[in-house]
Structure formats: C-alpha cells, structure tokens
Design a protein with these regions (language model features):
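Short, small/polar residue-rich loop motifs at catalytic or cofactor-binding pockets
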Residues: 285-290
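Radical SAM/AdoMet-radical enzyme domain recognition
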Residues: 69-92, 99-231
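Long, K/E/R/D-enriched contiguous segments that form extended
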Residues: 210-281
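Canonical Radical SAM [4Fe-4S] cluster-binding loop centered on the CxxxCxxC motif
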Residues: 25-63
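Radical SAM enzyme core and accessory elements
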Residues: 1-18, 312, 347-437
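N-terminal [4Fe-4S]-dependent radical SAM core
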Residues: 1-32, 77-83
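C-terminal accessory region of radical SAM enzymes
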Residues: 244-275, 307-356
C-alpha cells in the first residue's frame, strides 16, 4: 500500500507541505463555517436531517473573523496563537459552493486580516472544502481555484461508479449526480494534482464496494478513503458482504500488481488488535469535544457541525457554546459544557464490550452522533461494531495474500475469536488464513 494521505499528521503535511522549513506545528485549529444549510442533493445517507434555505451573510462572517483575530492575540483562549500555530478554515454546508460569493469574501477578508495583523498564521493557514461537485463549474468556484489554488484543499465525493453513486447521491427529483461529480473530480485532479477521493459505505451500497474501488482506480484516483457510516442500520449480513467485497478488492490488486501503487484506507495492518491501557489510548477519538469550533449562519458557535440543528433530530436541542455577542465558552454554562466535553474519554463513554474488545484499535466513533442518538456525547454508539470486525477480517485476507505473493512473513495477526470470525467469513476461509504464517 502507498502511504496514506488522510490520517491527521498526513492531512496537516498535505495542507502545510513546507512546514518542516519552519519547524513542527504543535497544534492546528480547525474552524468551520457552515456557509449554508441548503444543498443541491438529497443523499440517502446524509446525517444532516434538517436542511433549509438559510445562508451565511458576509456581515456575520466579518464579525466572526474579527473575533478570531481578537481572540488569537489573547493568552490562553481557545483560538490563541500560543495554542494554535496554524489554522484551517473549513467550509461545509449543505453544499458550500452554493454560497461561493460569500466564501470568496471570507477568503479575501481573512487574507487581508492576516497581512494587517502580521499574523503568525500568514504562512500556516489553509481553506478546506467538502463538496458534492454539482456547482464546481460555477465561474466563481473556478476563479477561487485560479487565485488561491495553493491554499485550497477541495474534496469531491464520488461514490465509486455510476450505479453506486446514483443510488445514494441524488437530486430531489431522484436523478443521479455521477457525471457532474466525476467531471469535477477529474478536472480538479488535472488542475491541482489531487488524486484522492472518498467513498462512503452504508447498508444500501455495501455490495458495490469492489466496483467502486476499481472504477476510481481506473480514473486515476489512487488514494481512496473509504469508511462505513456510524449510524444505526448495520446487520450481520452487511458484515458478510463487506468481507467478500474486501476479498475481491484484494484479489484484484494482487492480480494486477497494484497493491503497492495505491492506498485504500480500509486496509491498515496496524489496527484490529487489543489496545493497551495507557493514558494516550484513553483519549477521545473524536475532536468534537472541545478541539474544533463551528459557526452557523446566525453566528452561534458549536463544538462541531454535528451539534447544529441541521444534524439533529427534532427532539434534540442544539449544543450551542457561545455566540457573537458573548464569545466562545465565556458564559458559565458554556464553561461547564467545555469542562464536560474535555472530561470525556474512551473509558467514560464506552460499554464494557468495547473496553475488553480484542480488536479495539482503530475502531472509531463520532461524539456528535452520540449526542444526536442518545442526548449525550459521553455514550458511545456501537452500531459500527460488526463492520469493524468484518474490516479486520478483510485485512487478514489482504495481508495474508501479500505474504503469499511476496514470500514474506504475514505481518497481520487476527485477534478476533474463532466463533465470531467464522460467523462473518466462514470456516473455510478461517482455516485457510490460519495456515498463513
């Protein structure tokens, strides 16, 4: 496998490619602008439940940016230069490019303030986007890429190939968006050299994973980040399908000598083993408990966009931690919220089965989804559990195949108990892989 591009350290290295010239960056702050609640698509797996036609205005943006720089100069604030040697301005929606005029105003004004303040962030800032690609050809989007290309990280989601993509990523009238998304992704790759893409797996499309990967590879996207959604709905049958899909992908890669020419995030030999009981391993996986800040069109601040009204069921109150009038984490109730968020650990939120799980390493969760589902970020949703097990077994197959092909020792050890493994992969595969040393 090629080196990954999307773990945190590599994400920072990609956004700040020259950072080694200036020394290590101890901390990068991510500040998210939800520039609109509106979207051109109605994706079946979208976690934003309550979209609207609300758009962030430049008047609100200007106040937010002024507040960021005001707080950055003060010691011991969540945005201070002392704590944050760089900053990523993240744009999300809905679909962010629907508000491209304001996005350009945000970037222009932020760049102006960086120069005016002689800010330490002048050389350490980037703008990040997650887009469905539908509005990519907008002339303002192209203008932004032309002017600020080196400062941008734009992710266009393409769920593999047409049938798969158009099954989930659809317009309100039911039409698919594959052609527009692929056109955007390929043009962006040609202009910026970005050869990565993201595939979101859910129960509705898990059986199309193999075709999705092979199609993206054929289009020249050799860094493929794939993940299963955290939401409820996964069953044993889905785990069996995922394992078989990972087998097919593995066979395809080795048969075509592609195993060292691409990166597929779901294959990771360093995960799927027990976690040592250390202080570092007890930290919260997710950054949505005090590390990130998001702002909506009203100027309200949140620990993460998934605590906003757009991402929550009707009976769940948004978790607001400040506004433009009072600031971030300044009111007593907000200070208590921050103290609570920062106290959340793997142990505090996990059920016993997770703490003793033999393949706990690499099993992820989303604190915002925990809040959405249970009303607290300190209760871990485990709907993804069966898929983590299947992913581990798919890795066992991949790394065993690598060992056989290269005539080397298999570097992957299966820690999942035999009974649980056989339930997903079958007895024949379990016996076959157990013989590989």
């Amino acid at each position: 496998m090629l080196k990954p591009t999307e773990d945190y350290s590599d994400y920072i290295q990609r956004l700040f490619p020259s950072r080694d010239e200036f020394g290590d960056l101890k901390k990068i702050k991510t500040f998210t602008f939800q520039v609109t609640n509106d979207c051109s698509l109605c994706c079946t797996y979208c976690y934003e439940l309550n979209k609207s036609k609300d758009y962030l205005s430049f008047e609100t943006v200007k106040r937010v940016i002024d507040y960021i720089f005001e707080q950055a100069k003060l010691p011991d604030t969540i945005l201070s230069y002392e704590k944050n040697e760089g900053i990523i301005i993240d744009f999300i929606g809905g679909e962010p490019f629907l508000n491209i005029e304001v996005i350009l105003q945000i970037i222009n004004y932020f760049e102006t303030r960086l120069i005016e303040e002689d800010s330490p962030w002048l050389f350490f800032h980037r703008y990040s986007f997650s887009s469905n690609g539908v509005a990519y050809r907008n002339s303002k989007v192209q203008e932004m890429i032309k002017i600020y290309g080196d400062l941008l990280s734009i992710g266009i989601t393409v769920d593999g190939y047409k049938e798969l993509h158009d099954k989930c990523r659809i317009f309100p009238n039911g039409a698919g968006s594959y052609e527009l998304a692929v056109d955007a992704a390929i043009d962006l790759k040609n202009k910026t050299g970005s050869d990565s893409t993201k595939i979101t797996l859910c129960p509705e499309n898990i059986d199309k994973f193999f075709g999705a990967v092979t199609n993206m590879l054929s289009l020249g996207f050799v860094h493929i980040n794939a993940n299963c959604v955290f939401e409820e709905g996964w069953e044993l049958k889905d785990a069996k399908i995922l394992y078989q899909q990972m087998k097919k992908i593995s066979d395809y890669l080795f048969e075509n000598d592609l195993e060292d020419k691409c990166y597929i995030s779901i294959f990771n030999k360093d995960n799927f083993c027990p976690l040592e009981d250390t202080e570092d391993n007890n930290k919260n996986w997710c950054g949505g408990t005090g590390e990130m800040i998001a702002v909506d069109y009203k100027g309200d601040f949140f620990p993460c966009l998934r605590y906003m009204e757009t991402s929550l069921p009707k009976d769940r109150k948004p978790l607001i931690v400040g506004n433009l009038d009072c600031g971030i984490y300044t009111r007593e109730e907000d200070k208590k919220t921050l103290e609570f968020l920062e106290s959340i650990t793997r142990k505090s939120q996990s059920p016993d089965k997770c703490l003793v799980c033999p393949i706990a390493k690499g099993c992820a969760w989303c604190s915002g989804y925990n809040y959405s589902k249970f009303g607290t970020p300190n209760k871990r949703a485990t709907f993804i559990c069966i898929m983590h097990k299947a992913t581990g077994l798919g890795n066992w197959y991949f790394w065993a195949k690598e060992a056989e092909k290269k005539k080397i020792k298999c570097e992957f050890i299966n820690y999942l108990p035999k009974e649980e493994a056989i339930e997903i992969m079958g007895e024949n595969d379990f016996k076959m892989l157990s013989k590989v040393r």
